[in-house]
Protein backbone atom coordinates (compact mmCIF):
# COMPACT_ATOMS: atom_id res chain seq x y z
CA UNK A 1 0.00 0.00 0.00
CA UNK A 2 2.69 2.49 0.96
CA UNK A 3 4.44 1.90 -2.37
CA UNK A 4 1.40 2.68 -4.50
CA UNK A 5 1.32 5.90 -6.52
CA UNK A 6 -0.62 8.72 -4.86
CA UNK A 7 -3.31 8.75 -7.56
CA UNK A 8 -3.86 5.00 -7.14
CA UNK A 9 -4.13 5.45 -3.37
CA UNK A 10 -6.65 8.24 -3.84
CA UNK A 11 -8.81 6.19 -6.19
CA UNK A 12 -8.67 3.09 -4.00
CA UNK A 13 -9.55 5.19 -0.93
CA UNK A 14 -12.64 6.51 -2.76
CA UNK A 15 -13.61 2.94 -3.65
CA UNK A 16 -13.26 1.86 -0.02
CA UNK A 17 -15.13 4.92 1.25
CA UNK A 18 -18.03 4.19 -1.13
CA UNK A 19 -18.35 0.63 0.18
CA UNK A 20 -18.31 1.81 3.80
CA UNK A 21 -20.86 4.59 3.16
CA UNK A 22 -23.23 2.23 1.34
CA UNK A 23 -22.81 -0.74 3.67
CA UNK A 24 -25.84 -2.21 5.46
CA UNK A 25 -23.81 -1.88 8.70
CA UNK A 26 -22.49 1.01 10.78
CA UNK A 27 -18.73 1.39 10.44
CA UNK A 28 -16.42 3.55 12.50
CA UNK A 29 -12.83 3.94 11.37
CA UNK A 30 -9.89 4.81 13.61
CA UNK A 31 -6.17 5.29 13.07
CA UNK A 32 -3.65 3.33 15.13
CA UNK A 33 -0.78 4.59 12.98
CA UNK A 34 2.32 4.84 15.15
CA UNK A 35 0.44 3.54 18.21
CA UNK A 36 0.66 -0.19 17.53
CA UNK A 37 3.14 -2.38 15.71
CA UNK A 38 0.49 -4.83 14.50
CA UNK A 39 -2.04 -2.51 12.81
CA UNK A 40 -2.39 0.90 11.18
CA UNK A 41 -6.15 1.27 11.66
CA UNK A 42 -9.18 -0.22 13.35
CA UNK A 43 -12.57 -0.83 11.75
CA UNK A 44 -15.50 -1.10 14.18
CA UNK A 45 -18.52 -2.77 12.55
CA UNK A 46 -21.98 -2.63 14.14
CA UNK A 47 -25.01 -4.51 12.86
CA UNK A 48 -27.96 -6.65 13.83
CA UNK A 49 -26.62 -9.22 11.36
CA UNK A 50 -23.30 -11.05 11.35
CA UNK A 51 -23.94 -11.89 7.70
CA UNK A 52 -24.14 -8.17 6.81
CA UNK A 53 -20.80 -7.62 8.52
CA UNK A 54 -19.26 -10.55 6.65
CA UNK A 55 -20.66 -9.30 3.34
CA UNK A 56 -19.26 -5.80 3.94
CA UNK A 57 -15.84 -7.15 4.87
CA UNK A 58 -15.85 -9.37 1.79
CA UNK A 59 -16.55 -6.32 -0.39
CA UNK A 60 -13.75 -4.42 1.33
CA UNK A 61 -11.30 -7.27 0.67
CA UNK A 62 -12.21 -7.15 -3.03
CA UNK A 63 -11.17 -3.49 -3.36
CA UNK A 64 -7.70 -2.43 -4.48
CA UNK A 65 -6.89 -1.26 -0.93
CA UNK A 66 -8.50 -4.35 0.61
CA UNK A 67 -6.04 -6.64 -1.15
CA UNK A 68 -3.37 -5.15 1.12
CA UNK A 69 -5.32 -5.65 4.36
CA UNK A 70 -4.20 -8.36 6.74
CA UNK A 71 -6.30 -8.43 9.91
CA UNK A 72 -4.18 -8.56 13.04
CA UNK A 73 -7.13 -9.04 15.41
CA UNK A 74 -10.84 -9.74 15.07
CA UNK A 75 -13.31 -9.60 17.95
CA UNK A 76 -17.01 -10.51 17.98
CA UNK A 77 -19.48 -9.36 20.62
CA UNK A 78 -23.11 -8.33 21.05
CA UNK A 79 -25.05 -5.72 22.99
CA UNK A 80 -27.32 -6.74 25.85
CA UNK A 81 -28.56 -5.22 29.12
CA UNK A 82 -26.23 -5.45 32.10
CA UNK A 83 -27.45 -7.67 34.93
CA UNK A 84 -25.77 -5.31 37.41
CA UNK A 85 -26.84 -1.87 36.19
CA UNK A 86 -29.42 0.12 38.13
CA UNK A 87 -30.62 1.47 34.82
CA UNK A 88 -29.45 0.36 31.43
CA UNK A 89 -28.44 2.92 28.85
CA UNK A 90 -27.95 2.65 25.15
CA UNK A 91 -24.41 2.57 23.85
CA UNK A 92 -23.14 5.68 22.07
CA UNK A 93 -22.77 3.83 18.78
CA UNK A 94 -26.38 2.59 18.97
CA UNK A 95 -27.83 6.05 19.65
CA UNK A 96 -25.89 7.56 16.76
CA UNK A 97 -23.85 9.85 19.01
CA UNK A 98 -20.82 11.22 17.20
CA UNK A 99 -17.60 9.36 17.99
CA UNK A 100 -15.21 10.99 20.42
CA UNK A 101 -11.65 11.86 19.39
CA UNK A 102 -10.21 8.62 20.83
CA UNK A 103 -11.42 5.11 21.42
CA UNK A 104 -9.60 2.51 23.52
CA UNK A 105 -10.75 -1.03 22.79
CA UNK A 106 -9.80 -4.19 24.64
CA UNK A 107 -11.01 -7.72 25.38
CA UNK A 108 -11.91 -8.47 28.96
CA UNK A 109 -12.05 -11.80 30.79
CA UNK A 110 -13.07 -12.29 34.41
CA UNK A 111 -11.78 -15.15 36.55
CA UNK A 112 -13.82 -18.31 37.12
CA UNK A 113 -13.90 -17.36 40.82
CA UNK A 114 -15.89 -14.23 39.91
CA UNK A 115 -18.73 -16.27 38.44
CA UNK A 116 -18.80 -18.55 41.50
CA UNK A 117 -19.47 -15.63 43.87
CA UNK A 118 -23.08 -15.04 44.94
CA UNK A 119 -24.86 -12.54 42.68
CA UNK A 120 -25.41 -10.00 45.48
CA UNK A 121 -21.70 -9.96 46.32
CA UNK A 122 -20.84 -9.39 42.65
CA UNK A 123 -23.48 -6.66 42.40
CA UNK A 124 -22.00 -4.75 45.36
CA UNK A 125 -18.57 -4.79 43.71
CA UNK A 126 -20.02 -3.78 40.33
CA UNK A 127 -21.89 -0.88 41.97
CA UNK A 128 -18.55 0.38 43.35
CA UNK A 129 -17.06 -0.10 39.89
CA UNK A 130 -19.89 1.91 38.27
CA UNK A 131 -19.60 4.73 40.80
CA UNK A 132 -15.93 5.06 39.92
CA UNK A 133 -16.86 5.35 36.25
CA UNK A 134 -19.45 8.04 37.02
CA UNK A 135 -16.65 10.30 38.27
CA UNK A 136 -15.43 10.49 34.66
CA UNK A 137 -18.41 11.71 32.58
CA UNK A 138 -16.05 12.67 29.76
CA UNK A 139 -15.32 8.95 29.20
CA UNK A 140 -18.08 6.99 27.47
CA UNK A 141 -18.07 3.21 28.06
CA UNK A 142 -19.47 0.72 25.56
CA UNK A 143 -19.54 -2.79 27.05
CA UNK A 144 -20.49 -5.62 24.73
CA UNK A 145 -20.71 -9.34 25.44
CA UNK A 146 -18.67 -12.11 23.83
CA UNK A 147 -19.76 -15.12 25.93
CA UNK A 148 -20.07 -18.17 23.71
CA UNK A 149 -19.38 -16.34 20.44
CA UNK A 150 -15.72 -15.41 20.92
CA UNK A 151 -12.75 -16.10 23.19
CA UNK A 152 -13.33 -13.35 25.76
CA UNK A 153 -16.21 -12.50 28.13
CA UNK A 154 -16.61 -8.87 27.05
CA UNK A 155 -15.30 -6.27 24.64
CA UNK A 156 -14.85 -2.80 26.10
CA UNK A 157 -14.69 0.36 24.02
CA UNK A 158 -14.02 3.56 25.95
CA UNK A 159 -14.58 6.76 23.98
CA UNK A 160 -13.15 10.10 25.11
CA UNK A 161 -11.75 13.36 23.83
CA UNK A 162 -9.19 13.21 26.66
CA UNK A 163 -6.80 10.25 26.93
CA UNK A 164 -5.57 11.47 30.33
CA UNK A 165 -9.13 11.23 31.70
CA UNK A 166 -9.32 7.66 30.38
CA UNK A 167 -5.98 6.83 31.99
CA UNK A 168 -7.12 8.37 35.31
CA UNK A 169 -10.30 6.27 35.13
CA UNK A 170 -8.34 3.05 34.58
CA UNK A 171 -5.97 3.88 37.44
CA UNK A 172 -8.96 4.40 39.76
CA UNK A 173 -10.68 1.23 38.55
CA UNK A 174 -7.56 -0.79 39.38
CA UNK A 175 -8.22 0.08 43.04
CA UNK A 176 -11.75 -1.41 43.04
CA UNK A 177 -12.34 -4.81 44.63
CA UNK A 178 -13.69 -6.18 41.35
CA UNK A 179 -10.25 -5.73 39.74
CA UNK A 180 -9.03 -8.74 41.74
CA UNK A 181 -11.29 -10.85 39.51
CA UNK A 182 -9.86 -9.68 36.18
CA UNK A 183 -8.00 -12.41 34.31
CA UNK A 184 -7.27 -10.57 31.03
CA UNK A 185 -7.68 -6.96 29.96
CA UNK A 186 -5.20 -6.72 27.12
CA UNK A 187 -4.28 -5.85 24.45
CA UNK A 188 -5.32 -2.21 24.83
CA UNK A 189 -5.85 -0.83 21.37
CA UNK A 190 -5.64 2.97 21.44
CA UNK A 191 -7.03 4.78 18.41
Where are the regions a protein language model picked out?
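Glycine-rich beta-strand-turn "strand-cap" elements at beta-sheet edges
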Residues: 24-40, 61-99, 139-152, 177-191
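Short S/T/G/P-rich N-terminal loop/turn motif that feeds into the first structured element of a domain
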Residues: 1-22, 48-56, 70-135, 147-149, ...
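C-terminal functional regions that serve as terminal interaction/effector modules
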Residues: 1-2, 155-191
